[in-house]
Amino acid sequence: MINTENQSNFSIKTNIIASDNLEAYFLNTWELTELLFSSIKDVESYYINPDPRRHPLIFYFGHVAAFYINKLKIAGLYSETLNTHFENLFAVGVDPSTKDDLEKHGWPNYQEVVVFRTEVKKIILSIIQSDSLPKCIDWDSPYWSLLMAIEHERIHFETSSVLIRQYDIEMVKKPDGWMYKLDYDFNPELEFIKVESGNVQLGRPSNSNMYGWDNEYGSLNCFVKSFEVSKNMITNAEFLDFISSGGYETKDYWSEAGWNWIKSQNLSMPKFWIIRDQKYYLRAMFDEIDMPWNWPVEVIAYEAEAFCRWKGNNMRLLYEAEWKLLTDRYFNNELLDFDSYSNFNTNFRFGSPSPVGYFALNSDLPTDLLGNVWEILSNDFYPLDGFKVHPYYKDFSLPFFDSGHGMMAGGSWASTGNSASRYYRLWFRRDFIQHAGFRLIKTI
């Protein structure tokens, strides 16, 4: 397993760029991808779609490498021809609503992709080691494209881990040193905390010294009313009560889109749950394990919303401004200092979720505000005031500001670098599974 006891796992500071630090950060990023993909037993499995709305895994193996070349070319940092076919083939991911994207064929030989990746790695290292590397990189710098590509690869480390988790268990093996956080003696109860009203400002500060994606910039001032929030995220044990009470058979708990989805997929439990001989198991990354009842339940947004309706008493999911209020009162700096990460299951500290509240720092505050699993929010994905597209990646956020994409915050155990920042704003279709869960909230 990648050594998580060093700072090369954490997002680089853009105002004090040093080639050795940037090189370590890039290599750590690259090695995370290599480690994850080493879990695939046979090359043939790279050409299987673990999720029919995604490309086969071979695409993502090549995509993160091609992205470096394509963005560096746009920025003017690389102008040679490496492999035009691969640069085009691996350029853009799949749009689940586009049939032509889903039916793309003609994927290259695995070994050819390995060679391509090796060449890309050499190119990136040569750019990092060049005397022209600046000491400071900002939004307007051509080298922003390099940071963009590194953080993009870290995003795909996490999203690819979700795809691999959907492979048949016989197709994968757990890499050496990959650790699950199993602790069955920690059984928190559902507890609510009162949060007083307050003002918040959403958005990454313009003078931030970390890389940020375009949708993180801009700002929005909000007044947040007082509310009560569950101290911990909802656990597998708590979600079992919803299942046992007929939650998946009761239409009133579901939105129309959610009900249609679970019926079309014949769902009766969360994606990674397994029931065999009247006993529940959980599909972890590479194993089927006894159900860890104290882990946060991992669900799609539709399931989280249905649970809230089942609970009654006007229970709902957090809005982004409410989540921001919680983090403002927990954190006083942008990127937690290195020692503070000991309080959260993030930056690949473990290769799985952990018992909710296991790393609780302050008994008066909600737990797992960063890491463990993503926090599913109520918001549709939307731009902040003053949002502007970055010219190096014009379609990163803009096409997804709509009611079809819901937001998440806080990161997961698999979130690293920029993704582990409290300013990171994630979005997904509400029927897409991620390492994501939720907590309950009600307005007072």
Question: What residues fall within each predicted segment?
Answer:
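Disulfide-stabilized, aromatic/cysteine-rich ligand-recognition loop
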Residues: 1-55, 59-66, 74-133, 143-168, ...
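Short, conserved phosphate-binding/catalytic loop or strand-edge motifs used
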Residues: 137-144, 324
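Active-site-flanking structural segment that lines cofactor/substrate pockets
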Residues: 70
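Functional-site microenvironments in short loops/helix caps that host divalent-cation chemistry
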Residues: 149, 153, 163-212, 217, ...
